Amino acid sequence: MSRAAVAIALLGCVVAAYGAPAEGHDDAKAEWTGKSWMGKWESTDRIENFDAFISALGLPLEQYGGNHKTFHKIWKEGDHYHHQISVPDKNYKNDVNFKLNEEGTTQHNNTEIKYKYTEDGGNLKAEVHVPSRNKVIHDEYKVNGDELEKTYKVGDVTAKRWYKKSSSS
C-alpha cells in the first residue's frame, strides 16, 4: 500500500480511504439526526500527538505531519450509514458505506483491508486491519455538545483531534 494512501486515510478516517464511493446517494433520503456523532463536522486547530501517530505508522513527518483542514459527514440512509471524509488541500474526498457491527472488506492497491464500525456508550468506533502493514488502527468519535473528539490509536500511540459542528455541505 502506498504511503500517500495511508497518509490521506489518517488525515480523516482510516476506513474512508479504502471504501468505495456511495452508489446512488440521495441527499433527500439522508438522515442527519438520531446519533450524536451523525452530522457535518469541521476540524479545528486543536490536535494532540498526531506527529507521533504518523511516525508509529512509519510515514515521513515532513510529508504527512501537521494539521490539514478535514471534514467529516456521517449520515444514515435506509439501514446503512455513510462516512464521508474530505481533505480539500489534498484534493481528497471519499465515502464509506457501513452497517454497525458488520465487518466490511475492500481492496486498495491489491491490499485487503478489513474494517468494522461499532457503537459503544453512544460513541462511534472504527477498527481497521491493514494486514500488509501489520497494523490495527482504532478510531473513536466522542461528542460533547457541538464538539467531536476523534481519538486515533495504533499500537501504544494515541493521538486526538477535535471537530466542531458545521453547517457547510
From Swiss-Prot:
GO cellular component: extracellular region
CDD domains: FABP (cd00742)
Glycosylation sites per record: N109
Main location: secreted
Molecular functions (GO terms): lipid binding
UniProt keyword Electron transport, yes or no: no
Subcellular location: Secreted
Highest rank taxon of the organism: Eukaryota
Region (SAHS-c2): 75-103
Region called SAHS-c3, residue ranges: 116-165
Secretion signal, residue range per the UniProt entry: 1-19
Keywords of this entry: Glycoprotein, Secreted, Signal, Stress response
Function: Secreted heat soluble protein acting as a molecular shield in water-deficient condition. Tardigrade-specific intrinsically disordered proteins (TDPs) are essential for desiccation tolerance by forming non-crystalline amorphous solids upon desiccation, and this vitrified state mirrors their protective capabilities.
Note on domains (UniProt): SAHS-c1, SAHS-c2 and SAHS-c3 are 3 highly conserved regions within the SAHS protein family.
Additional remark text: Trehalose, a disaccharide essential for several organisms to survive drying, is detected at low levels or not at all in some tardigrade species, indicating that tardigrades possess potentially novel mechanisms for surviving desiccation involving tardigrade-specific intrinsically disordered proteins (TDPs).
Similarity field: Belongs to the Secretory-abundant heat soluble protein (SAHS) family.
The protein's name in its UniProt record: Secretory-abundant heat soluble protein 1
